[in-house]
Amino acid sequence: MANAQATEEEIEIVEEGTTAPQVTEPPLPATIAGLAALLEIPLDDCLVPCNFCGKFLSHLEACEFDDKRLSLIWKGHLVYACCRWCCTATATFEFNEFYEHTVTGREIEFVTGKSVFDIDVRCQNCMRYLDSIEKLDICGRRLPFHKVRDSWKGICRLCKHFYNDW
């Protein structure tokens, strides 16, 4: 059994008036895939609780969380994510509480002064980022874009299909 006590040679003595070197921790991962890589475990084995309801995300929900480009929530050294149901509830709450205004179709380009391709738009229902095709579809059909909490919202193809709005 190894001696657990350190000898004087093993202890770095800091002279009076100087400071000990700062130990910097690596940055905490923002994605579930990044967390699994840091822990060197398969993504299937990475169990992360929902910040709102406390249930552990399923493998599919973990993949959706990363696909939506949401960030992990760190409280001390405890990590939380957001399950599918709570993402929808959060999106609905934000829409109802922080709605600012609505533009139709290509009006979003005139209001923002940017091309629709350069505007970040999340789904107002599930919080996914809309891709270029989804944004062009909204513009072409003259459907609404909503400004909510300083961000733009629309409806993604998955939610359109779910709500039969196509």
Curated annotation (Swiss-Prot):
Its main location: host cell. It holds the Pfam family E6. Disulfide bonds: none annotated. SUPFAM superfamilies: E6 C-terminal domain-like (SSF161229). InterPro entries: E6 (IPR001334), E6_sf (IPR038575). One of its GO terms (molecular function) is zinc ion binding. GO terms for biological process: DNA-templated transcription; regulation of DNA-templated transcription; symbiont-mediated perturbation of host apoptosis; symbiont-mediated perturbation of host ubiquitin-like protein modification; symbiont-mediated suppression of host innate immune response; symbiont-mediated suppression of host type I interferon-mediated signaling pathway. A zinc finger (unnamed) spans 50-86, 123-159. Forms homodimers. Interacts with ubiquitin-protein ligase UBE3A/E6-AP; this interaction stimulates UBE3A ubiquitin activity. Interacts with host BAK1. Plays a major role in the induction and maintenance of cellular transformation. E6 associates with host UBE3A/E6-AP ubiquitin-protein ligase and modulates its activity. Protects host keratinocytes from apoptosis by mediating the degradation of host BAK1. May also inhibit host immune response. HAMAP family: HPV_E6 (MF_04006). This is Protein E6.
